[in-house]
Amino acid sequence: MIKVIICGALGRMGTMIANMVIENPELEFVGGVDIRDGTVLGKPVVPSEKLAAFIDEVKPDVMIDFTVAAATMINAKIAAKKGVALVIGTTGFTPEQDAELLDAIKNVPVVKTTNFSVGVNIFWELVRDAASRLGDYDIEVIEAHHRYKKDAPSGTAKTILKVIQEEVGKREEMYGREGMTERKNEIGVHVIRGGDVVGDHTVQFHQNYETIELTHRAYDRAVFARGAIRAAAWVPKAKPGVYTMKEVLGL
């Protein structure tokens, strides 16, 4: 069986992932890491400063990390040095952090993505196809999340923008509009924060007399956890390198 440890194991997402791990016959949950000691499903959770020793003790094959950028920067480097495969769902990295992290983890197999939902990964491919055919349309990206989400725009929205610009070329990202504005070579980006919205993402393609709109809505965080479980079962068999869910799903 594939031994799994979880960073942020005492949090809502970490606990959900742990419960899904024990339901998967390929995986074994052996413990976790958080800001304090504890237990999850009868397995030990240690503070992050003890991660290296904990890895030596329980010998995990995979570490799943859905925490915050600062914590992931530390934990992923430690795990990679120990030869542990990684599944990283943390978002909010600065470009400098992202480059540093990718360099530090390149010698182990890693699945790193801004969204583990199977539906979102299909959605990205639909957006790519539409953008490749509708390059002369005006494009707007709208995303909504719960009031507590820290990063804006979301990592998923940033991936949407990356996908679009790979197809239509570089455009200015226009975050909201105010006053007298003139349409230029841009993509409008609109961020909504409120209530308990799990995650809504919409891409609109506008042309005279018609609009095409693609939308993905997540109704439960379980969709992200399920994707992470698929990645955890896949990644130990992969060669060293950084992958996305596109490889996991065979898209």
From Swiss-Prot:
Catalytic activity: (S)-2,3,4,5-tetrahydrodipicolinate + NAD(+) + H2O = (2S,4S)-4-hydroxy-2,3,4,5-tetrahydrodipicolinate + NADH + H(+); (S)-2,3,4,5-tetrahydrodipicolinate + NADP(+) + H2O = (2S,4S)-4-hydroxy-2,3,4,5-tetrahydrodipicolinate + NADPH + H(+)
Keywords attached to this entry: Amino-acid biosynthesis, Cytoplasm, Diaminopimelate biosynthesis, Lysine biosynthesis, NAD, NADP, Oxidoreductase
Disulfide links within the chain: none
EC number: 1.17.1.8
Catalytic site positions: 145 (proton donor/acceptor), 149 (proton donor)
Subcellular location: Cytoplasm
Domain of life: Archaea
A GO molecular-function descriptor: 4-hydroxy-tetrahydrodipicolinate reductase
Pathway where it operates: Amino-acid biosynthesis; L-lysine biosynthesis via DAP pathway; (S)-tetrahydrodipicolinate from L-aspartate: step 4/4
The keyword Methyltransferase belongs to this UniProt entry's keyword annotation: no
SUPFAM superfamilies: Glyceraldehyde-3-phosphate dehydrogenase-like, C-terminal domain, NAD(P)-binding Rossmann-fold domains
Name assigned to this protein: 4-hydroxy-tetrahydrodipicolinate reductase
Native species: Methanocorpusculum labreanum (strain ATCC 43576 / DSM 4855 / Z)
